[in-house]
Regions:
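Glycine-rich, proline-tolerant flexible connector loops at the mouths of alpha/beta enzymes
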Residues: 1-11, 61-64
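Alpha/beta catalytic cores of nucleotide-metabolism and tRNA/nucleoside-modifying enzymes
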Residues: 15-33, 38-105
Length: 105
């Protein structure tokens, strides 16, 4: 599903991520989610649904194109703040405390 929903009938990443995470549980395989991650809330949702990490590209390209290294730092600070706020509102004090029952798909 990289680059958008190319096929109309393809499910969104968030719809299939919990199933993938369950199928890979205990295998040692890390789940990296790419595509559509723009905010700290998006990062939180992906982690809650079973991702081990997220990959973000386009927003960083936009940030560096618009304001160089300073733009990237502003974007990183924004992501970190949004993630921290979302975690706090959901009662998660660490990344390890983010759980599936904190989000709805």
């Amino acid at each position: 599903n990289h680059g958008g929903r190319v096929l109309d009938q393809c499910p969104a990443t968030a719809e299939v991520l919990p199933e993938i995470a369950e199928a890979l549980k205990g295998s040692g395989v890390k789940i990296l989610v790419d595509g559509g991650i723009r905010t700290g809330v998006d990062v939180f949702k992906a982690l809650a649904l079973g991702a081990d990490a997220v990959l973000i590209a386009r927003p960083f390209v936009n940030a560096i194109y618009g304001a160089g290294a300073e733009g990237v730092q502003v974007y990183v600070d924004k992501l970190a703040g949004e993630l921290a706020d979302t975690m706090s509102m959901c009662g998660a004090h660490s990344l390890a405390e983010i759980t599936r029952n904190m989000v709805r798909v």
